[in-house]
Protein backbone atom coordinates (compact mmCIF):
# COMPACT_ATOMS: atom_id res chain seq x y z
CA UNK A 1 0.00 0.00 0.00
CA UNK A 2 1.27 3.45 -0.91
CA UNK A 3 0.16 6.93 0.16
CA UNK A 4 -1.44 7.57 -3.22
CA UNK A 5 -3.49 4.36 -2.91
CA UNK A 6 -5.21 5.28 0.38
CA UNK A 7 -8.97 5.78 0.09
CA UNK A 8 -12.03 5.79 2.35
CA UNK A 9 -13.78 2.53 3.23
CA UNK A 10 -16.52 1.49 0.83
CA UNK A 11 -19.83 3.14 1.79
CA UNK A 12 -18.31 5.41 4.45
CA UNK A 13 -18.90 8.60 2.46
CA UNK A 14 -22.16 9.71 0.88
CA UNK A 15 -22.76 12.42 -1.67
CA UNK A 16 -24.88 15.36 -0.50
CA UNK A 17 -28.63 15.10 -1.13
CA UNK A 18 -29.55 17.98 -3.47
CA UNK A 19 -33.11 19.04 -2.65
CA UNK A 20 -35.58 20.81 -4.92
CA UNK A 21 -33.86 19.96 -8.21
CA UNK A 22 -36.76 18.62 -10.23
CA UNK A 23 -39.29 15.78 -9.99
CA UNK A 24 -36.89 13.23 -11.52
CA UNK A 25 -34.45 13.54 -8.61
CA UNK A 26 -36.95 12.04 -6.17
CA UNK A 27 -36.65 15.01 -3.83
CA UNK A 28 -37.79 17.90 -6.00
CA UNK A 29 -40.60 20.44 -5.55
CA UNK A 30 -41.19 20.25 -1.76
CA UNK A 31 -37.74 18.77 -1.03
CA UNK A 32 -38.84 16.36 1.69
CA UNK A 33 -40.61 19.07 3.71
CA UNK A 34 -44.17 17.91 3.04
CA UNK A 35 -46.91 20.33 1.99
CA UNK A 36 -47.51 23.78 3.52
CA UNK A 37 -47.25 24.71 7.20
CA UNK A 38 -44.66 26.44 9.35
CA UNK A 39 -41.98 23.77 8.86
CA UNK A 40 -42.20 23.85 5.09
CA UNK A 41 -41.39 27.55 4.88
CA UNK A 42 -37.91 28.98 4.40
CA UNK A 43 -35.91 30.13 7.41
CA UNK A 44 -35.04 28.16 10.50
CA UNK A 45 -37.43 26.92 13.18
CA UNK A 46 -38.35 29.27 16.03
CA UNK A 47 -35.58 29.16 18.65
CA UNK A 48 -36.66 27.62 21.94
CA UNK A 49 -40.06 26.49 20.59
CA UNK A 50 -40.86 22.98 21.76
CA UNK A 51 -44.12 22.32 19.93
CA UNK A 52 -46.42 23.90 22.52
CA UNK A 53 -44.76 22.13 25.47
CA UNK A 54 -43.58 24.60 28.11
CA UNK A 55 -40.01 25.36 26.97
CA UNK A 56 -37.01 24.56 29.17
CA UNK A 57 -36.07 28.22 29.59
CA UNK A 58 -39.49 28.85 31.17
CA UNK A 59 -39.58 25.62 33.21
CA UNK A 60 -36.35 26.43 35.04
CA UNK A 61 -36.26 29.28 37.59
CA UNK A 62 -34.28 32.48 37.14
CA UNK A 63 -31.07 32.46 39.16
CA UNK A 64 -28.47 35.02 40.15
CA UNK A 65 -27.60 38.40 38.71
CA UNK A 66 -24.65 40.21 37.15
CA UNK A 67 -22.94 42.55 39.56
CA UNK A 68 -22.12 45.69 37.56
CA UNK A 69 -19.54 46.72 40.17
CA UNK A 70 -17.56 43.45 40.08
CA UNK A 71 -13.85 43.88 39.35
CA UNK A 72 -12.66 42.14 36.20
CA UNK A 73 -8.96 41.40 36.66
CA UNK A 74 -6.63 40.05 33.99
CA UNK A 75 -5.00 36.90 35.40
CA UNK A 76 -1.25 36.47 34.83
CA UNK A 77 0.81 33.52 36.09
CA UNK A 78 4.37 33.76 37.38
CA UNK A 79 5.37 31.33 34.60
CA UNK A 80 4.19 33.85 31.95
CA UNK A 81 6.12 36.67 33.64
CA UNK A 82 9.27 34.51 33.85
CA UNK A 83 8.89 33.48 30.19
CA UNK A 84 8.67 37.16 29.17
CA UNK A 85 11.82 37.93 31.20
CA UNK A 86 13.66 34.96 29.64
CA UNK A 87 12.62 36.11 26.15
CA UNK A 88 13.96 39.60 26.87
CA UNK A 89 10.53 41.21 26.50
CA UNK A 90 10.33 42.24 30.16
CA UNK A 91 13.06 43.99 32.13
CA UNK A 92 13.41 42.33 35.55
CA UNK A 93 15.30 45.33 36.97
CA UNK A 94 12.50 47.81 36.13
CA UNK A 95 9.18 47.92 37.98
CA UNK A 96 6.72 45.44 36.49
CA UNK A 97 3.21 46.91 36.25
CA UNK A 98 0.19 46.63 33.95
CA UNK A 99 1.73 48.98 31.37
CA UNK A 100 5.00 46.99 31.30
CA UNK A 101 3.11 43.69 30.94
CA UNK A 102 1.05 45.16 28.08
CA UNK A 103 4.18 46.46 26.32
CA UNK A 104 5.79 43.01 26.68
CA UNK A 105 2.72 41.34 25.15
CA UNK A 106 1.92 39.34 28.29
CA UNK A 107 -1.56 40.91 28.51
CA UNK A 108 -3.75 42.58 25.89
CA UNK A 109 -5.44 45.15 28.12
CA UNK A 110 -5.56 45.88 31.81
CA UNK A 111 -9.38 45.91 32.33
CA UNK A 112 -9.72 46.66 36.10
CA UNK A 113 -6.13 45.68 36.82
CA UNK A 114 -3.84 42.66 36.88
CA UNK A 115 -3.95 39.76 39.34
CA UNK A 116 -0.86 37.56 39.65
CA UNK A 117 -1.26 33.83 40.38
CA UNK A 118 1.42 31.40 41.55
CA UNK A 119 1.47 28.99 38.57
CA UNK A 120 5.04 28.12 37.63
CA UNK A 121 8.36 29.21 39.11
CA UNK A 122 9.95 32.64 39.31
CA UNK A 123 13.75 32.88 39.20
CA UNK A 124 14.13 36.62 38.62
CA UNK A 125 14.13 39.24 41.37
CA UNK A 126 11.30 41.61 40.38
CA UNK A 127 9.44 44.56 41.85
CA UNK A 128 5.82 44.20 40.82
CA UNK A 129 2.96 46.70 41.18
CA UNK A 130 -0.44 45.11 40.52
CA UNK A 131 -4.08 45.28 41.63
CA UNK A 132 -4.03 41.80 43.14
CA UNK A 133 -1.88 38.76 43.87
CA UNK A 134 -2.55 35.41 45.51
CA UNK A 135 -0.75 34.59 48.77
CA UNK A 136 1.36 31.81 47.17
CA UNK A 137 2.33 34.22 44.36
CA UNK A 138 3.47 36.87 46.88
CA UNK A 139 5.45 34.20 48.78
CA UNK A 140 7.19 33.01 45.58
CA UNK A 141 8.05 36.58 44.49
CA UNK A 142 9.47 37.44 47.94
CA UNK A 143 11.35 34.11 48.07
CA UNK A 144 13.04 35.08 44.77
CA UNK A 145 14.10 38.36 46.40
CA UNK A 146 11.43 40.58 44.86
CA UNK A 147 8.62 42.68 46.28
CA UNK A 148 4.89 43.12 45.63
CA UNK A 149 2.93 46.36 45.90
CA UNK A 150 -0.86 46.09 45.71
CA UNK A 151 -2.82 48.99 44.23
CA UNK A 152 -6.20 50.13 45.51
CA UNK A 153 -9.07 49.29 43.12
CA UNK A 154 -9.69 52.78 41.61
CA UNK A 155 -5.97 53.35 40.94
CA UNK A 156 -5.76 49.99 39.15
CA UNK A 157 -8.16 51.09 36.42
CA UNK A 158 -6.20 52.79 33.65
Swiss-Prot record:
Keyword set includes NADP: no
Name this polypeptide is given: Large ribosomal subunit protein uL15
Annotated GO biological process: translation
Recorded family membership: Belongs to the universal ribosomal protein uL15 family.
NCBIfam families attached to this UniProt entry: rplO_bact
Organism of origin: Rhizobium etli (strain CIAT 652)
Domain of life (superkingdom): Bacteria
Keyword set, alphabetical order: Ribonucleoprotein, Ribosomal protein, RNA-binding, rRNA-binding
Amino acid sequence: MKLNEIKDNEGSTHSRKRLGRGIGSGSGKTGGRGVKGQKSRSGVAINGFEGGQMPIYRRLPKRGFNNIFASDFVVVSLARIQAAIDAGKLDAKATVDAAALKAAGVIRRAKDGVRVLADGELKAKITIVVAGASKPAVEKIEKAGGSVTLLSAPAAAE
